[in-house]
């Protein structure tokens, strides 16, 4: 399930309408949306059932998806920008970094998708697995 639509991405590019004649076609934008929706699922699937369906969570993930697609399109458009290429690529990479930071914080549990369905912790015959990191201290009895 895609987290964004062509119209959502189009709203970010006021001076460009995606068609079959533009440097980035509408079909390519839809492919980018599908690809980045799968990337998002990969990042959040360790904590939440995917695809995420909660309304508030969908709104957040839509913004992340749009940002990732926007970054990809800006990098493609920057190739033909001449002198402005470096600054446009820098902006595109900053947009991508912000979106990826959100996904990392969701994966680590620092950012919560309040209305998304949480995955149950995995149990095995050897023990209980959760997202907590083990802490081992030097020169201290821990058992």
What are these regions (language model features)?
Residues 71-143:
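Short loop/turn elements at secondary-structure junctions
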């Amino acid at each position: 399930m895609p987290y964004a639509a062509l119209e959502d991405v189009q709203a970010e590019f006021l001076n460009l309408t995606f068609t079959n004649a533009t440097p980035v076609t509408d079909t390519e934008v839809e492919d980018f949306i599908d690809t980045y929706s799968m990337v998002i699922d990969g990042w959040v699937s360790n904590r939440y059932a995917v695809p995420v369906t909660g309304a508030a969570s969908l709104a957040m993930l839509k913004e992340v998806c749009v940002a990732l697609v926007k970054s990809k399109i800006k990098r493609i458009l920057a190739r033909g920008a001449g002198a402005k290429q470096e600054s446009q690529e820098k902006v595109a990479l900053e947009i991508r970094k912000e979106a990826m930071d959100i996904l990392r914080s969701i994966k680590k549990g620092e950012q919560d998708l309040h209305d998304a369905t949480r995955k149950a912790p995995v149990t095995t015959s050897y023990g209980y697995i959760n997202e907590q990191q083990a802490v081992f201290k030097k020169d201290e009895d821990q058992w």
